[in-house]
């Protein structure tokens, strides 16, 4: 029992710097329009307008290996909960012929032990955990990401 308590205390002590740095990092990433200094707690700041979804049904190229595909259509009112998954009305194995939608990956039918199931694995059931619709949102911060093809094409310059 004492060993467990000591182990838990050491684990918490080791994790504390990470937790604290996460708080400060989140604080530093706050939008610039948040008022600084004293302000009424009831002050409401309007939210930025939502980015427009790109719904042209064009399949987007992936930027890195194993990137989940983007959703090329609107899903605003799709019900995805324990009772219903609207995505499955088109993307389930049984429905793809009629809908012409791509079937979900066979990996979605495997449980955590790699066993193939007859239906979608519960851990893959909530599509929007990984798959997101594409929007015309502008980046909040600069992005220097380059995919492997652009790095290889750039030669030494891309190998930084």
Curated annotation (Swiss-Prot):
- Which residues constitute the signal peptide according to the record? 1-25
**Where does it sit, as one GO cellular component term?**
periplasmic space
Task: Please name the source species.
Answer: Azospirillum brasilense
Q: Where does heme c 2 bind?
A: 108, 127, 130-131
Entry-linked SUPFAM superfamilies? Multiheme cytochromes
What this chain does, per the entry, is described as: Electron transfer subunit of the periplasmic nitrate reductase complex NapAB. Receives electrons from the membrane-anchored tetraheme c-type NapC protein and transfers these to NapA subunit, thus allowing electron flow between membrane and periplasm. Essential for periplasmic nitrate reduction with nitrate as the terminal electron acceptor.
Q: How does it assemble?
A: Component of the periplasmic nitrate reductase NapAB complex composed of NapA and NapB.
Residues that, per the record, bind heme c 1: 73, 87, 90-91
**Listed GO molecular functions?**
metal ion binding
Post-translational modification comment from the UniProt entry? Binds 2 heme C groups per subunit.
Write down what this protein is called.
Periplasmic nitrate reductase, electron transfer subunit
Annotated GO biological processes are: anaerobic respiration
| Record Gene3D superfamilies | Flavocytochrome C3, Chain A
Q: Where in the cell is it found?
A: Periplasm
Keywords carried by this UniProt record: Electron transport, Heme, Iron, Metal-binding, Periplasm, Signal, Transport
Q: Tell me the protein family, please.
A: Belongs to the NapB family.
Name the InterPro entries on file: Multihaem_cyt_sf (IPR036280), NapB (IPR005591)
